[in-house]
């Protein structure tokens, strides 16, 4: 399972997120998108070497996140189970009468050649 898919299941969980600039954010996840952008509510944000700031909501760009600190009570074994079965990729079926090759009609021709005899 991809990390982002796991994080998307963490809605309504209270977590601490450490950012790459050293800021720590503690809040309840309202959503995570495929770019790992994380949206939180009831947030306490502590900038490095500063006093904590209370915020109602906060959105964090995914590439600014260093790591998530998850609560110990989180049932990881149930969250990590892959609910969606993996879809096996089907081989493309050959187009009727065309075979598997590309044929002669592809490409840009053979160029001007190397100076052979002219016609």
From Swiss-Prot:
UniProt region (Disordered), positions on chain: 88-119
Cross-link (Glycyl lysine isopeptide (Lys-Gly) (interchain with G-Cter in SUMO2)): 86
Keyword vocabulary terms for this entry: Cytoplasm, Isopeptide bond, Methylation, mRNA processing, mRNA splicing, Nucleus, Repeat, Ribonucleoprotein, Spliceosome, Ubl conjugation
Family matches, as CDD domains: Sm_D1
The record's account of how the chain is modified after translation: Methylated on arginine residues by PRMT5 and PRMT7; probable asymmetric dimethylation which is required for assembly and biogenesis of snRNPs.
Region (Required for interaction with SMN1): 69-119
Main location: cytoplasm
SMART domains: Sm
Spans annotated as Sufficient for interaction with CLNS1A: 1-80
Domain of life: Eukaryota
More details: In the autoimmune disease systemic lupus erythematosus, antinuclear antibodies are developed with Sm specificity.
Record's protein name: Small nuclear ribonucleoprotein Sm D1
């Amino acid at each position: 399972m991809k990390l982002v898919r796991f994080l998307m299941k963490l809605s309504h969980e209270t977590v601490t997120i450490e950012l790459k600039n050293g800021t720590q954010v503690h809040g309840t996840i309202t959503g995570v998108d495929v770019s790992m952008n994380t949206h939180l509510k009831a947030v306490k944000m502590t900038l490095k070497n500063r006093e904590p700031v209370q915020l109602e909501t906060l959105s964090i760009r995914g590439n600014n996140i260093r790591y998530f600190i998850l609560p110990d009570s989180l049932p990881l074994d149930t969250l990590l189970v892959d609910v969606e079965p993996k879809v096996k990729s089907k081989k493309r079926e050959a187009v009727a009468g065309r075979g598997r090759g590309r044929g002669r009609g592809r490409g840009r021709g053979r160029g001007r050649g190397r100076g052979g005899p002219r016609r």
